[in-house]
Amino acid sequence: MGVSIVLGSQWGDEGKGKITDMLAQQATLCCRAAGGHNAGHTIVHGNKTYDFHILPSGLISPSCINLIGAGTVVHVPSFFKELASLEEKGLEGASKRIFISDRAHVCLQLHSVVDGLEEAKLGGRKVGTTGKGIGPCYSDKASRRGIRVGEILDEAVFERKLRSLDAGYRARFGDLEYNVEEELAQFKEYRKLLGPYIVDQLAFLQKYKDSPNTLVEGANALMLDLDHGTYPYVTSSSTGLGGAMQALSLNPTSIKSVIGVVKAYTTRVGSGPFPSEQFNADGDKLQSVGREFGVTTGRRRRCGWLDLVVCRYSQAINHYTALNLTKLDVLDDFDEIKVGVAYILPDGTRTENTIPADAEVLEKVKVEYVTLPGWKSNTMGVKKYEDLPDNARAYIEYIERELGGVPVKWIGTGPARDDMIARE
């Protein structure tokens, strides 16, 4: 098996879907390793726009088989709704090319209710979750009381475990705006439909062990990783290279490329430290020109300059072999472009490649910037590297040097599927 892994290098929303879509055209198998329907990205294919959340974007390729892996959490109503939406838009046969690991966990409506209650209790220190129930679902998984997808098929086991979860949360929160009987009734119907999609993951993957092109689609990003991100303002899964390997039982020697997706500036949704965030006209311009609204939540994304401290840290953990720089065209109309190159910590220490583990400390760092000249010309839809303005190429090559020579092999120049430069 030859495996390529696509990972977000910042706080998500980097544009991973487009490179995944492009690579999926040659892939036999495309896998999601972690996360749930809290993830979200958009792919423009022909004259149609597809929004993906829990489903792998390899579904756009008619020859690619897709797997939702063991590290994910699956909201079953969203799975069927998203699948129906894709088929209505013309992705015929998508339902025949998607499978779910029996070891993935079930994200319930109960979890969404609890998510809202937990956020409310945090008050001013809330995490800023998507409200989709992802955190409570992973919490139940870690506490060994969660429900796996394979257990949906055993009605008695599913009912016993769901009633136990309901009772436990009622003991903690009191009365809930949740009806366990309604959810049990819904799953009585889903049980009839789910059987063909559920697979023993290891046996399933063994069928593809000789495939030269397997693609792993990361969700969220390194700075939202449960261990390495800006804890506690993170998601509840392992979003980096290690998480992908664990969730899909990957042989390390089979990995042929790890692709880090880097937005040409930085965005973040939700609460938490964001050192290079811009509370000024530059931030507003990045937000409006980049149309920075979350696919899943619709929330306005926070915007700032490219932060190379974050990128170096991400590179050190995920070991990228190549980079995809996205949304270069959003910077077309800036006279000058700033890049964060170092942090000055509250004690005066300067760091270029590490992120303080303490979120309170990270909130207080000062960013050291370099200023690069803008290019003030249109890069939208450019297909060849040599056709980019000189200063745009200088910006890309500066990033390569600062990230230890990892090549920027792909450059996004617009929202369309083919608005991408592929460098040799």
From Swiss-Prot:
Keywords on this record? Answer: Cytoplasm, GTP-binding, Ligase, Magnesium, Metal-binding, Nucleotide-binding, Purine biosynthesis
**What is the UniProt remark on how the cofactor binds and its stoichiometry?**
Binds 1 Mg(2+) ion per subunit.
Instruction: Name a GO molecular-function annotation.
Output: AMP binding
Catalysed conversion reaction: IMP + L-aspartate + GTP = N(6)-(1,2-dicarboxyethyl)-AMP + GDP + phosphate + 2 H(+)
Principal EC category: ligase
Which positions does UniProt annotate for substrate binding?
A: 295-301
Per the Swiss-Prot or TrEMBL record, the active site comprises: 13, 41
UniProt cross-references to InterPro entries, sorted A to Z: Adenylosuccin_syn_GTP-bd (IPR018220), Adenylosuccin_syn_Lys_AS (IPR033128), Adenylosuccinate_synth_dom1 (IPR042109), Adenylosuccinate_synth_dom2 (IPR042110), Adenylosuccinate_synth_dom3 (IPR042111), Adenylosuccinate_synthetase (IPR001114), P-loop_NTPase (IPR027417)
Residues holding IMP: 13-16, 38-41, 130, 144, 220, 235, 299
Which amino acid positions bind GTP, per UniProt?
12-18, 40-42, 301, 327-329, 412-414
Annotated EC: 6.3.4.4
Needed cofactors, names only, are: Mg(2+)
Output a single Gene Ontology CC term carried by this record: cytoplasm
Q: Which Gene3D superfamilies match?
A: Adenylosuccinate Synthetase, subunit A, domain 1, Adenylosuccinate Synthetase, subunit A, domain 2, Adenylosuccinate Synthetase, subunit A, domain 3
Q: Where does Mg(2+) bind?
A: 13, 40
The alphabetized list of GO BP terms reads: 'de novo' AMP biosynthetic process; cellular response to cadmium ion; IMP metabolic process
User: What pathway is this protein said to act in by its record?
Assistant: Purine metabolism; AMP biosynthesis via de novo pathway; AMP from IMP: step 1/2
Question: For this UniProt entry, what is the primary localization, expressed as one broad class?
Answer: cytoplasm
- What is the annotated localization of this protein? Cytoplasm
Family under the similarity heading: Belongs to the adenylosuccinate synthetase family.
Q: Which PANTHER family match?
A: ADENYLOSUCCINATE SYNTHETASE
This molecule's function is given as: Plays an important role in the de novo pathway and in the salvage pathway of purine nucleotide biosynthesis. Catalyzes the first committed step in the biosynthesis of AMP from IMP.
Quaternary structure?
Homodimer.
Q: What is this protein called?
A: Adenylosuccinate synthetase
Q: Source species, please?
A: Aspergillus oryzae (strain ATCC 42149 / RIB 40)
